[in-house]
Amino acid sequence: MNTQVLPVNEESIALAAKLLQQGELVALPTETVYGIAADARNGEAVKKIFEAKGRPQDNPLIVHICGMEMLHGIVSEVPERAKKLAAAFWPGPLTMVMPRGPEVSEVTCAGLDTVGVRMPSHPVVQAVIKASGVAFAAPSANLSGKPSPTNAQDTFVDMDGRLPLILDGGESAVGVESTVVAVTGEHPMILRPGYVTKEQMEAVLGEEVLVNHAILEKLKDGEVARSPVMKYKHYAPKADVTILKGSFDAYRDYIAAHAGDGVWALCFDGEEAQLPVPAISYGKEGDGISEAHNLFTVLRELDRKGAKTVYARCPLSDGVSMAVYNRLIRAAAFRVVEV
């Protein structure tokens, strides 16, 4: 298959809409990361996403819409909490898990009776949804397990020959996938952290928002994944990543004792020159927004530089930094060392 990479204009948006209507795949930019879109109602089209990514089909996908009216048929009920959160954060990087409606393919939801829905703010996604009339399922546009792409070039590296079209809309602003929150049950619960934080949602809802244990630790054997990325290793570069938890001095000393061929440091701004091995920063210490924006791009850069072993500085685990820690701990296959 020949994969075209086209700049965003009326013609390329019309082509993307036509392909989606025909049951084909399109990769396109969102404000979070680049995604692979297919008609969420068309099970055969959605299966192509799993094939293109090499992704297990028990990993649910998120449905993307461009207006509240599109929820009809996608969900069977819009809880009051969802209406409040939508008013505050849609369009934007928030996915809400609600009872599944009759129009969504079972393949999209991995057989669950719930579905995650998001209204993205990126103008390209909105334009394609409007032009096609299709609510689409769209995970990140990477091969399964690799870091999510935040630009068209990295998307092409993974998806060349796997789908017909990539729309080049420049760099994604946020850099990590959306927050996923389940809005049914006694309390809302974060299933995947992102740019919209626990604290922000609590301020809107006036109630506690719980955090699922699988955000910062592995799922237990036999436990069902309720959200994307809960079950499998994700976001990983080719190198073995280990997170080092402790002071900068302890981090530097640990790396000095483990230096060798192919060893790299993944650190914070301003620390690179103080380390005994090649180093690359993923943002300002304590600044979850900058860390989130840079993380996946930097993990892919480590691949390009031939890193074999990466020792990463540990981010915080609250606010937007919770999303960074969640991605990094999975890239490290939960290898964390106290130093």
Each language-model region and where it sits:
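Active-site-adjacent structural elements in enzyme catalytic cores
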Residues: M1-V339
